[in-house]
């Protein structure tokens, strides 16, 4: 009886892992499609362009 419970739990874990990985694959394709056609790549800027320096330069 214990072995059947163990097998059931392992099958449930494997099914959850497979469902999660297939969802990630679907989202990867969608992101790639949207980035190429609709969005331009914009690098991250730490500070705005008109941000004053923290201390005056000598």
UniProtKB/Swiss-Prot annotation:
Signal peptide extent: 1-19
Tissue: Expressed in mammary glands.
Lineage top rank: taxon: Eukaryota
InterPro entries: Histatin/statherin (IPR030773)
Subcellular location: Secreted
Record keyword Secreted present: yes
Main location: secreted
GO aspect biological process, one term: defense response to bacterium
One Gene Ontology cellular component annotation held by this UniProt entry: extracellular region
Keywords, alphabetical: Secreted, Signal
UniProt similarity note: Belongs to the histatin/statherin family.
Protein name according to UniProt: Histatherin
């Amino acid at each position: 009886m214990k072995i059947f419970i163990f097998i059931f739990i392992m099958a449930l874990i494997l099914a959850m892992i497979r469902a999660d990985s297939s969802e990630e694959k679907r989202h990867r394709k969608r992101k790639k499609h949207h980035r190429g056609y609709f969005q331009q790549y914009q690098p991250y800027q730490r500070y705005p362009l008109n941000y004053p320096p923290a201390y005056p330069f000598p």
